[in-house]
Structures are given as C-alpha cells and as structure tokens.
C-alpha cells in the first residue's frame, strides 16, 4: 500500500496566510489535494502540519486524513516528511509513500493512479512526474529509501535522496503543467487560481 503524505507545515511567509486553506474552485487547497489523492486510489493520507497547526486542524476536521504535527517545522520540508516516515515505520503494509506539497493544488487523480501502478509493476524505488523535461509533484519513495530520507541533510532535503538514486528513479511524462506549479506567493495565486 502507498500512503500519501501531504506536507503543510511551513509558515507561508511569502503568501501571508495558510496555503492549506486558500480557496480554489469552491474548495481549499488541502481539500482539493486530498480529494484528488482519494480519486486516484490512495486510501491512507497523512497531513503534516506545523505553523498554525491548531487553526488548520480546526478547518480540516472533516477530511479523511491523519494529522501529524511537526514542532520542528522551521527546519524545512524534509523535517516534516521525517515526522511522517517515523510514524509509518512500524506499518509493514506501507510499501512506500507518495509525497505531495500543499502549495501544488493542481494534482491529477489519473496521474496519481498511473504513478502507483507503475511503482507496483516495477522495481524502481522512486517515481516522479515530468512535464516538458521539468520534474514535479507528487513523488513516490519506496519504503527501502525511508532510512535514506531519515538521514538526508536538512539543507538538501529529499532531492539529495533522488539525486543519489538516479538509476532507481522512474520518470513519468505528465501532460498537465500543474505538477510543476508551486503557488507560494499572492501574485502566483492571483495569476493561476483567481484567473482560472
């Protein structure tokens, strides 16, 4: 089983408000992401919160997710992923994790399904989508790499693990540019969301 981990612990300093709660197409970013993951066949979803955790938790109380809180969120995204990996370590049914970022709301359920299928059918340890040569999110990491992710340098993040395992990485071409769209400023939000 692939468990999705949505990283939503940052301070959103450039955006000025919690990205998880930003409206998009009648939902919030986090609702849209969780819905797409569910439609893509992901049964178990963990959301890692940090800054403003209680405020966000109150707003997403009805979502079918497990909530973890990273009290060390200032260390960066990798620290939030590590909180989830430690939580999953004892769950032997977890074959890997699909990591997604809350500021990437344009996630395609068909791509989610395809990525899991390709992961299950292959011996690759990492599955990453690519649009016009540029990699995006979500990214699947095999359980075999949990140790490497837990030991990766904080300043390099999960990219250090991807770079160290290039031969074990499968890239999947994605038609949707949304996989690379990181909406982390008010300007990008107005351009890509409010201008839908």
Language model: regions and residue ranges:
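Hydrophobic residues at beta-strand termini and immediately following loops
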Residues: 24, 68-70, 129, 172, ...
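N-terminal glycine-rich phosphate-binding loop and ensuing alpha1 helix
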Residues: 1-57
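Short aromatic/basic micro-patch
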Residues: 23, 106, 139-140, 171, ...
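Conserved N-terminal catalytic core of the sugar/cofactor nucleotidyltransferase
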Residues: 32-96
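Conserved beta-loop-beta/alpha segment of the NTase-like Rossmann-fold superfamily
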Residues: 74-148
């Amino acid at each position: 089983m692939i468990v999705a981990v949505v990283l939503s612990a940052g301070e959103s300093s450039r955006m000025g408000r919690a990205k998880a709660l930003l409206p998009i197409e009648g939902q919030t970013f986090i609702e849209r992401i969780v819905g797409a993951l569910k439609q893509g066949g992901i049964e178990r979803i963990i959301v890692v919160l940090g800054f403003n955790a209680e405020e966000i938790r109150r707003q997403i109380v009805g979502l079918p997710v497990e909530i973890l809180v990273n009290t060390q969120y200032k260390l960066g995204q990798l620290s939030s992923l590590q909180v989830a990996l430690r939580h999953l370590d004892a769950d032997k049914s977890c074959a890997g994790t699909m990591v997604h970022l809350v500021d990437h709301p344009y996630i395609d359920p068909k791509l989610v399904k395809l990525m899991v299928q390709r992961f299950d059918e292959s011996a690759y340890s990492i599955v990453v989508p690519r649009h016009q040569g540029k990699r995006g999110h979500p990214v699947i990491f095999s359980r075999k790499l949990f140790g490497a992710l837990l030991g990766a340098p904080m300043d390099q993040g999960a990219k250090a693990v991807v770079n160290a395992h290039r031969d074990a990485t499968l890239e999947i071409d994605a038609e949707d540019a949304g996989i690379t769209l990181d909406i982390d400023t008010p300007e990008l939000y107005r351009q890509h969301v409010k201008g839908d």
